[in-house]
Amino acid sequence: MKTFSSFLQIGRNMHQGNQTTITEFILLGFFKQDEHQNLLFVLFLGMYLVTVIGNGLIIVAISLDTYLHTPMYLFLANLSFADISSISNSVPKMLVNIQTKSQSISYESCITQMYFSIVFVVIDNLLLGTMAYDHFVAICHPLNYTILMRPRFGILLTVISWFLSNIIALTHTLLLIQLLFCNHNTLPHFFCDLAPLLKLSCSDTLINELVLFIVGLSVIIFPFTLSFFSYVCIIRAVLRVSSTQGKWKAFSTCGSHLTVVLLFYGTIVGVYFFPSSTHPEDTDKIGAVLFTVVTPMINPFIYSLRNKDMKGALRKLINRKISSL
């Protein structure tokens, strides 16, 4: 992390030269009243703990149960890791700021936070698309599943997803550190996000916004299209199953993932395609909370409640811990 911050500082100095630049940002958060701050602290601390524990249990259960050592659950374990990392990237700093009554964050820390927020949003998107394809193969081509979705292929897809996420985040970061912020350093947000930072800059952000639009649209459209057509084929295949038990088994395999997909893209449509024209800053905050806090917290419940294999693995893990006491 220190090396990354040093890299940001060097890059910033190269592009900005001797011009006066800011050294920190002020995060305004949600409310200014102290009583609201205390409520926010308790609320976000609770959601943070639930998210870390829930997703952590999924990762441990998958790693300990050899039956779940398949590409399907490799993707789920990585999604849980990304969810833990996503909420840990923003919420702890916000909680510290509330307790210390300090709203400042250094320039390097802010850009680093922005970098990782992009990584985790993109990886979530890519993993959801990859998981949809995995479910398509499992339901529509069950006899060829072990051939089409070999463990090495699952690992390759995971590595590619993480690689692309970091490349996209690095691209936005390298473009951002070339911008000047003059004397404007107040962010109407609870963490450093790309869109509010671009609005704050006093430089020309046309290239940044163009790259954000093109890359962002590509990152959304490709996984969404893959998920959409995968589930169209899955639904058609399930409807052709004659037995009720067979239909239920197919639904339990992909139902939890479909719920997460609908939640994820429903959030995108609701927040970014139908934004509030009167309070655009509130829209940014709502979108950030849904992506970085609410969705990561809900995901473990969806996967554990609606996935038979996952429920069995979690039950084994809990029983093992109880018996060891």
UniProtKB/Swiss-Prot annotation:
Between which residues do disulfide bridges form?
C110-C202
- Which regions face the Extracellular side of the membrane? 1-38, 93-113, 172-208, 273-285
This entry carries the following GO cellular component terms, namely: plasma membrane
Biological process terms from the Gene Ontology for this record are: signal transduction
Q: Where in the cell is it found?
A: Cell membrane
List the PROSITE patterns. G_PROTEIN_RECEP_F1_2
Function text: Odorant receptor.
Q: Protein name, please?
A: Olfactory receptor 1S1
Q: Which organism is it from?
A: Homo sapiens
Name the gene that codes for it.
Answer: OR1S1
